[in-house]
A protein has these predicted regions:
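Active-/binding-site microenvironments in catalytic and ligand-binding cores
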Residues: 1-241
Length: 241
């Protein structure tokens, strides 16, 4: 959902989605509504929002370093619009594969992971074993932390205070594991898909470059996974197409 009067979970610094009527009965009441033959009248609205203000794929050209985005393209190709590495191919063809839900919050006995709480590939495999499933090559990896669901259960000021999300944390071993497993897509119920600031290096969001820019792994962010996780737990079925 977007433009919720109570607010939506967005990255700090991005404005909330805004919806407004540009035509409704009020315009007709004050004589400003357009008239058509017969008794036809109408209401219309418009929305203003960040394209990363709801559930979405990060384009592979979303981040870069050393003046190069994914596949060696120049960062200059992002000027004005993404001439390379946009989400257009995903929009045209989609992505289909075996999905596997790893419920890290449930595995750790929590409703939601703590702010800044981390996990790595070994933790993912341990959680999978506890669920009785195996992460296979080329799986679409869906990871629940409970973080987005918690937004709707507490005051937004509390959610954003000292903002640091839980999530995957960088290591060379983790990046090698993702490469060896040929994971095409990571989906999480967080805004940025990884811990906000790496606790070892102090670098912000290092996996965005390590996984997207270097390996071409797509990231899906701000997914509401609580209903899916509850259904999977009830059925003890954690994989799906």
């Amino acid at each position: 959902r977007m433009a919720d009067p109570a607010g939506d979970p967005v990255w700090p610094g991005r404005s909330q989605s805004k919806r407004m009527n540009i035509m409704d009965r009020g315009h007709y009441n004050c004589g400003k509504g357009p008239h058509f033959p017969g008794s036809y009248e109408f209401a219309d609205d418009v929305m203003f929002f960040h394209l990363q203000g709801s559930t979405q794929y990060d384009a592979l050209g979303h981040v870069w370093y050393d003046d190069q985005i994914w596949n060696g393209y120049s960062a200059d190709t992002t000027i004005g619009s993404l001439a390379k590495a946009s989400v257009a191919p995903l929009g045209e063809k989609g992505m289909v594969g075996r999905g596997i839900l790893i419920d890290m919050a449930r595995h750790r006995g929590k409703e939601v992971l703590d702010a800044g709480e981390t996990f790595n590939h070994e933790d993912l495999m341990a959680a999978a074993r506890a669920q009785g499933v195996t992460i296979n090559k080329r799986d679409i990896l869906i990871i629940r932390t409970g973080w987005i669901g918690s937004f709707y259960k507490r005051d937004p000021e509390e959610f954003y205070k000292d903002f640091i999300e839980p999530g995957l944390t960088y290591s060379p071993e983790l990046v090698s594991w993702f490469q060896e497993m040929e994971i095409p897509n990571i989906v999480t119920d967080t805004i940025a898909n990884e811990v906000t600031v790496d606790p070892v290096s102090g670098v912000a969001l290092p996996l965005h470059n390590a996984l997207m820019r270097n390996l071409g792994i797509t990231l899906t962010e701000i997914a509401q996974l609580d209903p899916l996780a509850d259904d999977c737990a009830a059925d003890q079925q954690w994989t799906f197409l």
